[in-house]
Amino acid sequence: METEKIIRLSVRNLVEFILKEGDIDNRISGTLDKDAMLMGGRLHRKIQRMMGSNYQAEVSLKLQLPCDGFQLKLEGRADGILLESEKTIIDEIKGVVRSLDRVEHPVPVHLAQAKCYAYIYARQQGLKQISVQMTYCNLDTEDVKRFREEYTFEELEKWFLDLVHQYERWAKLQIEWEKRRDALIHQTKFPFAYREGQFELAASVYRTIYYKKKLFIQASTGTGKTMAVLYPAVKAIGEGLGDKLFYLTAKTITRTVAEQAFSILEEKGLAFRSITLTAKEKICFCEETECNPDACPYAKGHFDRVNDAVYDMLEKQKKLTRESIERQAEDFHVCPFELSLDLSEWADGVICDYNYVFDPTAHLKRFFADNVSGDYLFLIDEAHNLVERGRDMYSASIYKEDILEVKNLLKDRDKKLVKSLESVNKLMLEMKRECENYRLVESVSPFAIKLMNLLTQMERYLEEERNAGHAEQPDAFMELFFQVRQFLEIHELLDENYIQYTELEGNGRFKIKLFCVNPAENLNHYLKLGNSTIFFSATLLPIDYYKQLLSVEKDDYAVYAESKFPQKNRKILIGSEASTKYTQRGTEMYRKIAEYLRITVDGKNGNYIAFFPSYQFMEDVLEEFEKRSSGVELVIQSQFMSENQREEFLEMFEEERDHPMLGFCVMGGVFSEGIDLTHDRLIGVIVVGTGIPQVCNDREIVKNYFDQRGMRGFDYAYLYPGMNKVLQSAGRVIRTEDDRGIILLLDDRFQNRQYQQLFPREWKEYEVCGRKEIKEKMEEFWKNR
């Protein structure tokens, strides 16, 4: 007998999905949504503590309900349950910035959420009647206003079952799709002949998902890692080991690789709804991304129409491409970005940036806001990027100068807000006087308390301005508003993985920073909501470093997948006469490096790229190169290139030419990873320097943090991030088994064991040479083609 499908859903998602209506208006929801701040926040807890011993706070509630052809498993958390003499009251707490006199009745969605909790609790406890209490608290005055309504169980059941009934047509549509999808997954074969080691890699991925573990994969170019990870994950979904996969990337170009892999599988007969989430600014129909009904016609009435747009796409099994989503948004007159987010709930695979899952200020609330776990599979591509991205996402700063700027903007407009800004500024001034360069601080809690008051005043001011018809506010005000809110959200996360410090920057700006040195714990908060995680990259070395900073588990799996490209197709040389140490820099060294470049490109006509540690270093070498080389076509990366300029740069490598072309690029930039220049489009890469980051306070804090814990602080702060840039840059050449190419490493430090032990296994054959020897080494390599 076939087991009934179980659909898991949070109470919040059910209510918001079925009962959504009205306009998109980020002047309200984008600025005044306090749920994230209140959850676990000071005021929330204060109200709960005041309710006495008969009050149970944060009560987890679950209900599995038989429906037409499936079981609905609902999960949620009631803010509180109050047991009075003969009454049971479900309490839902919401913070507001407007005067409580203007709160005349509960917000329908808030009330519906509380009624769901009341029904679940009454059903489980056998209660004939139960009360629902909506507690609204003004965030400025901390005054409280309550609305209480009593319901019989029969009333609640009728209302609740009607809500579920509205959801049933969606669930049945999804179940039918999944039956078809799973049948075709079972029939879909691996789309290529397995390369050597590729089957074993795919088997490792499937095994990891089966046992609900994490896997770290170091897979060099040529292992076919994308398909070896994606195919077994899709198979696992067909076997019921997951119901949605998130393919997470750091860069747009990597998302294209994932899309191509899905397309290849679909050509082999797979039916799998995959969607790529495009940034709001890129997919927006309007010139300015202003999400409110006054500025955007698609925002007006969006929630009244969007469910019809979603259902139509699902029912007609339209592909969820950017183009089809934009057409559907036009047809139904809805926001294309919000439509794509709604469609992601019904997709089998979501391709998106890291921040949609991990960023506490930008994650997809529909999946990750309520701490409700799901059968998610996380496939994290180019996972070496997640360390720095994680640090950025979980860190926050406030600048004194930004506080002053907003204070001066508003000095004649709102006394209470200006007073709060002055209070914050005064405390920052005291901290600035104690700081020469940077200073570690034991606790910034007194500062955070002042920021809480400031945020409340800013929200009150926004509310009053909007009611007076002045919705638009200066950019400086809104930027500070979001910075303050982010700072307070990050402050809630503080633990032993953080360092708090003040810094007086070289330009005179003073900041207070919450710096997340080790993001593993925060990342794990989201990863534990899924079943399994696969971290993979061509440069995940040393793997223990990444395990330390990306995971908190001690029993994670790890695999090294070696490239099977012929060793004879790769020539690795270390230039013994080059150095990028600061003490060695100068015209003479730039001249030597320029000569290495000239000899390399003279060895064979074709396309080359040289990667440098900085734009300034690149320009210094370029100046010397241009003095000594003619007949070499140059293409140069510039700072702040637009997407069109990047495309034009890469198109230069498509042309056939009878002379050498040399690209001048920066390590760690847009062209040092993710680009795929196969065959003769690129035949040589020169990496200038070890990639070691410049010394700065953040780096020194990382170094000292790990030194104090008995780990190799210099390696964690400088060596490993630097060598990752080197490996990524070098990986731009030799992309297929037929490619041949040169990798020239220009820094005498590459001769040291400290650096060579971080070389991938494929680099075991290398030669050290000066400028005199390099020419014959090149000639010999190209002659033996």
List the model feature ranges, each with a label:
Residues 210-232:
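Walker A/P-loop
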Residues 229, 256, 332-349, 353-459, ...:
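Signature of the SF2 helicase/ATPase Hel1-core->accessory helical subdomain module
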Residues 1-86:
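Metal-dependent nuclease catalytic cores that hydrolyze phosphodiester bonds in DNA/RNA
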Residues 63-157:
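Mg2+/Mn2+-dependent nuclease catalytic core
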Residues 325-350, 361-368, 461-579, 584, ...:
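A contiguous, basic/glycine-rich beta-loop/short-helix subdomain that forms a polymer-engagement track
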Residues 188, 241-350, 358, 429, ...:
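A substrate-engagement module of RecA-like helicase motors
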Residues 576-588, 637-751:
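Conserved RecA-like P-loop NTPase helicase motor core
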Residues 176-218:
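Conserved pre-motif I regulatory segment
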